Amino acid sequence: MKIGVIGYGHRISSVIKEVMKADVDCQIAAIVDIRKDAVKAQLDEQGWHHIHYYDTPEQMFAAEQLNGVMIGTRCNLHTTMGLKVLQHNLPLYIEKPVATNYEDLLRLKQGYEASTSPVVVSFPLRVTSLVELVKEIVQSGKIGTVEHVQAINNVPYGRVYFQSWYRNEEETGGLFLQKATHDFDYIQAVLGQTPVSVCAMTSKQIFKGNKSAGLKCVDCEDNRICLESTVGTVEGLDPTWQYCCYAEDTGNEDSGSALFRYESGMHMSYSQNFFIRKGAAARGARFMGYKGTVDFDFYTGQVKVHMHHTARVETYDLAAGSNHFGGDAKLARNFTEVMKKKASSISTLDDGLMSALMCMKAQESAQTGTFQSLKWE
């Protein structure tokens, strides 16, 4: 099974490893990357001498007979590169978010509808053992129909969104698209309901300031006293997290919340935070019905069912796992099966489009102070 890669970044490289673990028949046949010489040197050291390298997707498609394509470019190129693959009707694995603006989202939707490509979107949380157990409990009717959802994501490594390239909102599309997209997707996977409107709010209270644009920690006069300084740190931070998070060009909100109304009349609340640290980390949700409540947290690896009319609480302890809590391995295996026509996608582009639409409408609501309808317009 020959796979082409467009954009060989850190994230997609880890997914590729999972794909090759899942199926020994899979191999990377070709890579398109603006850093192709550096990527070639890196992979040659690993003994991957068989790979062909190209400057453009068009060159790759003209020269290679591929069984599938994986896209790992920066976020603002996901749509453009995705459309190139869809035109060839090849199986596609695409990173989230599938688009970073509404125009691209519509283009991708139209391209998908005109293509026969099966698509797997990188939404690993929906296929973790935790979420699958919650979905099983909800679908059993044990807690009754879900009539309210409360979800949170308190991110302990939030500095990456203010000190690395993620701080550029033009590339990322903002933090609803970067983080909430995962959460909105797993909530949708559990609920199976249609959201119709949203109101949202964001704040930037911590990571703002008047330090000069482009300032790096190493060049800052406060780098020995600043709590966010990467100079002399003992935490082993990624060396690319080098920019000042208090500079005037630091993008992204540091907290955000959204309320979604569904067709049934129920609503879901979601809140995310990017300046908490250490033990304050939390990521999960509560699904509430009249009979009971089921809640879970990815960091603890626990699922709890609280019955409302009996003195009973059920607790399930599951290993949280690594690589998005084990979800990456499941998606990788699914992609290999999709390429071999043995299975359908368990994380479709329809799912990716809906999650992106929810994020974009939440962002628009926060920017305009208005309710937004979740319609394709």
What residue ranges belong to the model's regions?
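Beta-loop-alpha module in the N-terminal Rossmann-like domain of NAD(P)-dependent dehydrogenases
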Residues: 9, 48-111
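N-terminal Rossmann-like dinucleotide-binding module
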Residues: 1-48
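Active-site loop of classical SDR/Rossmann-like NAD(P)-dependent oxidoreductases
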Residues: 34-38, 278, 322-333, 350, ...
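Residues that mark the start of a beta-strand
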Residues: 2-4, 145-148, 267
